[in-house]
Amino acid sequence: MTKSKKQKQKKKDFLKKKLKVGKPTGKPSNSTDTSFTARTLSVRSQLVNNAGDDLRKRLPLLKHHNDKVRKETLGIYIKAIPKIISTQLMTPLISQTSQLICDDSKDVREQLLELFDEVGKHDEQVLKLHCRSLVLYINMGMTHILPRVQADSTKFLGCLLKYCGQEFCDQAWNKLMAGIFRVLSWETQHSKNSNQAAGAMQTSKRDNKFQAAHLSTLYALLECGCKEPTVETTDEDTTSNIQNFEEVQYMTPSFPQAYGYLKLFDKQLKSSSSNKDNSSVSSSDALDVESRIRNVENVYLPTMKKQIEQIIQEGGEAGKNANNIKKLISEIFS
């Protein structure tokens, strides 16, 4: 092909075609014929069956740097809970959302509280299976450096006590009681450090508006841990329970981690002498109601009575909750 022919072909690309009236325009060279018809059209990336995969792909967004993205992602999971409550997606969902208990954003924490409540309404066993990690992050929230995170930690505890309160009391009774006392800025029999007392006085003035919520959570924890659960049984049930007592011992337990108190697979760290004074009762010694009542009487009851009387005199919503705790204490220790 000569040089002149190449130049002519290049010029054709830049020439403007003249349009004539009544004559159609010419089709371009790269046009596609769309005159065919099809009965079905399948697009693999838009199948309805891939809804679960889409939710699984959204899990990394729970760690996004933008708090609005985290909140919107939690809202999507709240709407999808009825569909995914019995799927394998719940395990990674609870394990990743439990970390947001210590999130800096208030909107994210409120949305997370709604998510836990929605999960508990549909299937409380899901929360019971993850109660160990939930207790861990609630305890981290109670000792958080940010006051707003510390104040909201009791809201999560109060919500989860409705669905897995017995498991919480069995596994971390002393930690939860000490955490609520720390949030309320109350001293126990074992906290005699003057620096802690000075810090408690400063935080008590700052957190007065959250005091009513903390006291209601304390009431729920005491009621769940120090009162025997009331179960209505008939005479036929009692006789059948006595006959099948030996069989029940060898059957699958009705609650998760039935032998967790034995700590067969847990690695325990050696505690120093200073830490021993702060925890008079270990978690394995607070598995029944009697030991928890004994723990409250020896460690928390004197301070509780003293502080409650002062709050009742101040009145308000906190005074009402303190009065309820006073009635509960008199009922337990009567």
UniProtKB/Swiss-Prot annotation:
This is Pre-rRNA-processing protein IPI1. One of its GO terms (biological process) is pre-replicative complex assembly involved in nuclear cell cycle DNA replication. It is found in: Nucleus. One of its GO terms (molecular function) is chromatin binding. Residues 1-21 have a biased composition (Basic residues). Residues 1-35 are annotated as: Disordered. Gene3D superfamilies: Leucine-rich Repeat Variant. Pfam families: Ipi1_N. Belongs to the IPI1/TEX10 family. InterPro entries: ARM-like, ARM-type_fold, Ipi1_N. SUPFAM superfamilies: ARM repeat. Keywords: Nucleus, Ribosome biogenesis, rRNA processing. Component of the RIX1 complex required for processing of ITS2 sequences from 35S pre-rRNA. Signal peptide: none annotated. One of its GO terms (cellular component) is rixosome complex. Component of the RIX1 complex, composed of IPI1, RIX1/IPI2 and IPI3 in a 1:2:2 stoichiometry. The complex interacts (via RIX1) with MDN1 (via its hexameric AAA ATPase ring) and the pre-60S ribosome particles. It comes from the Eukaryota. Its main location: nucleus.
